[in-house]
Design a protein with these regions (language model features):
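Short, threonine-centered small-residue motifs that mark membrane-proximal processing/anchoring sites
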Residues: 1-30, 231-262
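Helix-boundary and membrane-interface capping/anchor signal
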Residues: 29-242
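Short, charged juxtamembrane terminal tails flanking transmembrane helices
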Residues: 264-268
């Protein structure tokens, strides 16, 4: 009877440990620190309620203020990433001891392996998805820009030659929140980019830790803009994802299996 009781208690302790891990309520984490490494711009909010790069906002201030944002690899000289060979990184730290690293895109990332199979590199995947999206507007824009009924392969070559990918490589990070293993962040962009060739509805591209994020279609009206020709920062693209289970949980499951196996052997 005593041996049976000990066996029950040992098994119960493993189950209780697992239960505590899986059923612990998610807690919203507070961002405690935010630092940028590399070329960047900070856009604060001016007295008119619009974004302004002439600001005394810190990186943390910008991420905690509605409408403000941090542009990675950004410059006022042109609308492309400053450095396509070296990524600008934004590191956010939280009071749950977790860290998220946001990165501008580089030539190595565009030319690197694609998340999906069937593509030689990420640039091919991104362009294929954008071209075939009914919401991006890319096909009509490219055809209007070229002046003829251009096909996808020719358009892709043109994008590569004209370095259009650079224009999507300097993401504006507006906010970052974390609740347990759930992460949500906003990219600031155009509500509807439009020029003489047509309109585009596409977010910029950002890497978070080892994952790449982007979107096509309508942005959410941010209520602010940068007062430039294309009304930058007037749209928001929101992304949410779940961080995979930590290795500690897998280790705990393995320990539970080992305990059970050991006890089975002891009974023989």
């Amino acid at each position: 009877m005593a041996r049976l009781l000990n066996k029950f208690l040992a098994s119960a302790s493993v189950v209780a440990g697992l239960s505590g891990v899986f059923s612990a309520p998610a807690m919203a984490a507070t961002m405690t620190k935010a630092t940028v490494n590399g070329a960047h711009l900070i856009y604060g909010i001016n007295e008119d309620g619009n974004t302004d790069h002439e600001t005394d906002f810190s990186v943390l201030d910008a991420l905690n203020t509605d409408g403000a944002n941090v542009e990675l690899s950004g410059t006022r000289d042109h609308n492309k990433a400053v450095d396509m060979n070296n990524a600008t990184t934004l590191t956010t730290e939280f009071d749950d001891d977790s860290t998220l690293v946001f990165s501008s895109l580089t030539n190595d990332i565009w030319g690197g392996s694609a998340p999906k199979e069937g593509y030689d590199n990420f640039a091919e995947q991104w362009f294929d998805e954008a071209w075939n999206s009914e919401e991006s507007g890319l096909q009509d824009y490219a055809k209007n820009k070229s002046g003829f009924n251009i096909d996808q392969d020719t358009a892709f070559e043109g994008f590569m030659l004209e370095n259009w990918f650079h224009r999507f490589s300097d993401p504006n990070v507006e906010s970052v929140t974390k609740n347990g293993r759930y992460v949500s962040f906003d990219l600031s962009g155009h509500l509807n980019y439009e020029d003489e060739h047509g309109s585009l509805k596409m977010s910029e591209v950002v890497m978070v830790n080892d994952r790449i994020f982007y979107a096509f279609g309508d942005a959410i009206d941010s209520g602010v803009d940068n007062k430039d020709e294309q009304s930058s920062h007037s749209g928001i693209y929101t992304f949410t994802y779940k961080i995979p289970e930590p290795s500690a949980v897998l280790g705990l499951i393995a320990i539970g299996g080992m305990v059970a196996a050991t006890k089975r052997r002891a009974q023989k």
